Swiss-Prot record:
Keywords: ATP-binding, Gluconate utilization, Kinase, Nucleotide-binding, Transferase. InterPro entries: P-loop_NTPase (IPR027417), Shikimate/glucono_kinase (IPR031322), Therm_gnt_kin (IPR006001). It catalyses: D-gluconate + ATP = 6-phospho-D-gluconate + ADP + H(+). The gene is idnK. The lineage of its organism: Bacteria, Pseudomonadati, Pseudomonadota, Gammaproteobacteria, Enterobacterales. Belongs to the gluconokinase GntK/GntV family. It comes from Escherichia coli (strain K12). PANTHER family: GLUCONOKINASE-RELATED (PTHR43442:SF3). This is Thermosensitive gluconokinase.
């Protein structure tokens, strides 16, 4: 099934880029690293340890929404990396594309801190992790398009959790479209 976007969301260091690229490869889908769409001034700020404001994030979120909409219009499937820390950010990403889903890579502070301390070459300093956890608005009950993925496992397990979530989302969409809950494959 095509024309859909799966947004890998979560704080910095949760594994969005690594897991997103692996799941995209497994499912022969496009992969878009949201960090590549940040305006240069945003990267400069974060590199200096300065958290981004909502105003800073808006042009970036609009670029990501454009990328998602393009996938939808081209009838393609893609995995897009975006922290999506606040509901208002997720709402921007949902605009115009009916098949946007979020895979929330969720883990505890200590696990993610340890991972960030081991990685090299990323512009996001470890010092900003606390501000990311503070900014995170945990998904609400009305956000039915978000699947929580427990990242306190190895990479293969987290990748498989994401792959299974995508397959379940697709199956649910087929069942809803057919309106046939009695169909065996929809049970």
């Amino acid at each position: 099934m095509a024309g859909e976007s799966f947004i890998l969301m979560g704080v910095s260091g949760s594994g969005k880029t690594l897991i997103g690229s692996k799941v995209a490869a497994l499912l022969s889908a496009k992969f878009i690293d949201g960090d590549d769409l940040h305006p240069a001034k945003n990267i400069d700020k974060m590199s200096q340890g300065i958290p981004l404001s909502d105003e800073d994030r808006l042009p970036w979120l609009e670029r990501l929404n454009d990328a998602s909409y393009s996938l939808y219009k081209k009838n393609e499937t893609g995995f897009i990396v975006c922290s999506s820390l606040k509901k208002q950010y997720r709402d921007i990403l949902r605009k115009g594309s009916p098949h946007v889903h979020f895979l929330w890579l969720d883990g505890d502070y200590e696990t993610i801190l340890a991972r960030m301390q081991r990685r090299a070459g990323h512009f996001m300093p470890v010092a900003l992790l606390k501000s990311q956890f503070e900014a995170l608005e945990r998904p609400q009950a009305d956000e039915q398009d978000i699947v929580r993925i427990d990242i306190n496992h190895d990479i293969a397990n987290v990748t498989e959790q994401c792959r299974q979530a995508v397959l379940a989302i697709r199956q649910n969409r087929i069942c809803a479209k057919e309106g046939s809950a009695s169909d065996q494959r929809c049970e």
